[in-house]
Amino acid sequence: MTEHVRRLEEITLNSSSALRQQFYDGWILRFSPGSEVKRSNSVTALYPSTLEVAAKIAYCEQAYADAGLPTRFRLNASSLPAQLDQLLAERGCRKIEPTLVMLLPLRQCAAQPVAPGFAVKDLDEWITLSSALRGKPRETLEARRQRLASAPVSWFPVTLTVAAQTVCSGIGGRDGEYFGLFDLFTPEALRRRGYSTALAISLIETARASGASYAYLQVDEANGPARRIYERLGFCPVYTYWYRTQV
């Protein structure tokens, strides 16, 4: 596993805390009953292991059954052992949600102006604004606020305002020299006006100002329009991860 991939895997786990986490012979089991976040409710096979693989899979299946959760594995091409994905497929686990992780070395891109109307918010205020932008009650994002607050990451909750209207929101998170771009959202009626691109550029500049060396993000592999936007900003694919699930 390349060092970028391993470090990004560790960082993305840090960015989404779990209620309970267990290390098991190189695998990380995470449990968060009530949360829909798969990264917080899955096994990440990140480090070398020594035990027999089929027995380990059975152990994980029982652990998640005991927790009242489906068994999910979060995998990439470098997951260990190498045959794990094939073994899970043979057990009937479906492959879902392939997601591309993209990286931007900040020293390789020229600085750009931060968009007018871009602002870094207090986390509680951002939750309120983001909930309203998505048309959801604030309570629906309360669990998200708690996960963010408990994660070992420096957060930069941001919004973009145009003509006194919040048109886009997102959040940046710095972990060491890496700065992640998360949850960029623009309502359907306000899309195709460049707001998400403006917010992404402003977050990249926030990353630079914070002292980070790299910006990174995760995007649905099938989301061609979003991928093209990020590629124009200089992001390059590093690896893809996916889930194997019993459900």
For the regions a language model picked out, list residue spans one by one.
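Conserved GNAT acetyl-CoA-binding A-motif
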Residues: 67-77, 207-218
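Conserved acetyl-CoA-binding loop-helix of GNAT-fold acetyltransferases
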Residues: 53-61, 183-188, 192-209, 228-232
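Short amphipathic alpha-helix that is part of the acyltransferase structural core
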Residues: 1-9, 44, 99, 108-147, ...
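N-terminal charged segments
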Residues: 1-66, 80, 139-140
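Conserved active-site alpha-helix within GNAT-family acetyltransferase domains
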Residues: 80-95, 197, 221-240, 247
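Conserved beta-hairpin
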Residues: 21-25, 77, 83-94, 154-170, ...
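Acyl-donor-binding surface of acyltransferase catalytic domains
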Residues: 53-128, 134, 138, 244-245
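A conserved beta-strand-loop-helix scaffold within acyl/acetyltransferase catalytic domains
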Residues: 139-189
